[in-house]
Amino acid sequence: MCGRFSLSSNLEELQNEFSNEISGNFPAKYNISPGQSPVVISLKKNNFYLNKIHWGFRVPKLTKLVINARSETINEKPLFKNLFQQNRCLIPANSWFEWNNENK
């Protein structure tokens, strides 16, 4: 996943994509970055729910947040293995992009 994304769809637009209703509410955001709490869609007891989750993992040996995993090794790495098998979610997004620091 890229380092930034936006979500401007409203609840009605998301509900049109799913067979059962999604409960919850959220404002549009155009610059969601690691460390923030974006909205995700999770499935519990055959119902979809909107939840906010913290984006990123703190690893003691690293200064930056870990924000993504390689699909080829996600089921092998200790940090991601259990999460990948048990705690999946959908991350709704209208766009994604990498931040450019060249002019700073």
Locate predicted features:
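Short linear sequence motif anchored by a di-proline
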Residues: 1-104
